[in-house]
């Protein structure tokens, strides 16, 4: 095994989710030298495995006023700085005949106290503005919910961090912490692409690894007690609702239907699991049944809608040090300065929270880093727009007005003001790779050159290749060829990655493999094995 020379920086961030990316951006904007390490790809943990809800905070108003206030504040900030990552759909909290209508008044009052706009509307009006809603509803409240693309949001933060000097090392797994006495001064990493190992040095290391943060802390012989909660979701094959639809009751299973990009999602379940199971993302038949049964109560059209795939993620719920049983685990933001907590300097853990509050979590963590380094520059991430959101979409669309509407619309929706740099180029760049999501060859090249793409799976999260109705059936081979053309992969690697990509798609389809989904999967298998000669896929563990 080869060992590379060490690198030095001011701060090392472990974890490539939204929080880690946000910390990298904040630190870089404050003039710090930053290295971020992620064992897989960006947004492969809880960040990329949630429902993409741009919380207004209304969901938490009754049960957690502090979280509700944080959410509405960050909601308003993201609508300013991340316009190309969010869609202000608004949301409806509906009351069904089986629910307690009197809860609506409690709900509205709690929203008002948290600073959240909540307007009771007539059920008939709710049916007009959201035709998919259950017509049997007896009450509705309109709130400023929306949707956010977690992959796009994370990539934009990473891109801004890189453009301000940060080094982003994906496919690099932390194998240990480097210590000098009672101080952490770096990490040891292994590059999964080359097998090389390397020592990275910095006076501050930030553990932003989410649920895996407990394992990272153990490298320093520290104990962070986490209680993993698995949440499962289903994706519809098209967008069936235009507003976020919630049940007006205390949070429960399968009570949010979220429209996002070209699809809708129903979620989530909540199941405590053993820590040893955090990498097992299988969705069970029982969870699928719950999601379908409860989801149809929100929008009856779900009963006639094809389910595209299922997936799950694990929330990092943190117990306080004096609560070993986990009876009172927190869903709030948890910031641990291990110098104060454990007598170990140079090491900080940021965990808990939610996608909605990633920027606030990053601000807290970066403030802690700067205190240690004597850096007095203020946080500016609430005011500075992310790459892609630095001009209105209408202005960007006018710059590419001569191009076909589906291409320019989809590209600007995903990449905002960065689109004209590549979409207006030659004929090849405008050629379609993925018809379902209108992804072009130019978009693939842009992602390769700017967004840390090392594989087909990486490309999926940057461009939505393979995330449409065909689940890669018609576009995966084209995308694999382009990655080879753009010198990301060799011929042998392209074939291996194609097989890996299709197997990953199947893992999400398998829990709902009936009817059209099963027929399409069989057709995909025939195309790649029978027609293209791809070797039989590795036997799936499912």
What are these regions (language model features)?
Residues 7-9, 194-204:
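Core beta-strand elements of the Rossmann-like FAD/NAD(P) dinucleotide-binding domain
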Residues 14, 200-210:
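Short hydrophobic core segments
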Residues 207-221:
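Flavin (primarily FAD) binding-site architecture
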Residues 28-48:
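Glycine-rich FAD pyrophosphate-binding loop
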Residues 52-125, 129, 255, 397-404, ...:
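Dinucleotide-binding Rossmann-like beta1-alpha1 core, especially the glycine-rich loop
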Residues 150, 160, 225-232, 240, ...:
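C-terminal catalytic lobe of FAD-dependent flavoproteins
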Residues 11-35:
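N-terminal Rossmann-like FAD-binding beta1-loop-alpha1 element of flavoenzymes
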Residues 94-164, 169-170, 176-183, 188, ...:
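Flavin (FAD/FMN) cofactor-binding and adjacent substrate-gating region
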């Amino acid at each position: 095994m080869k060992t590379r020379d060490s690198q030095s920086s001011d701060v090392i961030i472990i974890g490539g989710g939204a929080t880690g990316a946000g910390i990298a951006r904040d630190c870089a904007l404050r003039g710090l030298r930053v290295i971020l390490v992620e064992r897989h790809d960006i947004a492969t943990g809880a960040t990329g495995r949630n429902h993409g809800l741009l919380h207004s905070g209304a969901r938490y108003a009754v049960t957690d006023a502090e979280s509700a206030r944080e959410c509405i504040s960050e909601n308003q900030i993201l609508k300013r700085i991340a316009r190309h990552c969010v869609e202000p759909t608004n949301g409806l909290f509906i009351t069904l005949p089986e629910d307690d209508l009197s809860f609506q008044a409690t709900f509205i009052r709690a929203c008002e106290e948290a600073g959240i706009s909540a307007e009771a509307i007539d059920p008939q009006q709710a049916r007009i503005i959201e035709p998919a809603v259950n017509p049997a509803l007896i009450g509705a409240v309109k709130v400023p919910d929306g949707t956010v693309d977690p992959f796009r949001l994370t990539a934009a933060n990473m891109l801004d961090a890189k453009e301000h000097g940060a080094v982003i090392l994906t496919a690099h797994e932390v194998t240990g912490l480097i210590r000098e006495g009672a101080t952490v001064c770096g990490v040891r990493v292994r590059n999964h692409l080359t097998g090389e190992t390397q020592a990275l040095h910095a006076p501050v290391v930030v553990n932003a690894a989410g649920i895996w943060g407990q394992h990272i802390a153990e490298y320093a012989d520290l104990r962070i007690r986490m209680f993993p909660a698995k949440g499962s979701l289903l994706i519809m094959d098209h967008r069936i609702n235009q507003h976020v639809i919630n049940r007006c009751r205390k949070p429960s299973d399968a009570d949010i239907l979220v429209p996002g990009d070209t699809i809708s999602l129903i979620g989530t379940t909540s199941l405590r699991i053993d820590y040893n199971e955090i990498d097992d993302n299988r969705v069970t038949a029982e969870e699928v049944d719950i999601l379908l049964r409860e989801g149809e109560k929100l929008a009856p059209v779900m009963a006639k809608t094809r389910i595209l795939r299922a997936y799950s993620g694990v929330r990092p719920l943190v117990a306080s040090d004096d609560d070993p049983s986990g009876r009172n685990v927190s869903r709030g933001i948890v910031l641990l300065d291990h110098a104060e907590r454990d007598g170990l300097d140079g090491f900080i853990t940021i965990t808990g929270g939610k996608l909605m509050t990633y920027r606030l979590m990053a601000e807290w963590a970066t403030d802690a880093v700067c205190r240690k380094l004597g850096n007095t520059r203020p946080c500016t991430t609430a005011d500075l727009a992310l790459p892609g959101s630095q001009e209105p979409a209408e202005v960007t669309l006018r710059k590419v007005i001569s191009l076909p509407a589906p291409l320019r619309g989809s590209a600007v929706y995903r990449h905002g003001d960065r689109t004209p740099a590549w979409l207006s180029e030659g004929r090849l760049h405008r050629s379609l790779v993925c018809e379902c999501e209108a992804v072009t060859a130019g978009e693939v090249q842009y992602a390769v050159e700017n967004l840390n793409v090392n594989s087909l799976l990486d490309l999926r999260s940057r461009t939505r290749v393979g995330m449409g109705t065909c689940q890669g059936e018609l576009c995966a081979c084209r995308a694999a060829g382009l990655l080879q053309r753009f010198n990301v992969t060799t011929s042998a690697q392209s074939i291996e990655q194609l097989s890996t990509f299709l197997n990953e798609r199947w893992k999400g389809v398998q829990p709902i493999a009936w009817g059209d989904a099963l027929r399409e999967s069989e057709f995909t298998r025939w195309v790649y094995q029978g027609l293209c000669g791809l070797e039989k896929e590795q036997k799936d563990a499912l």
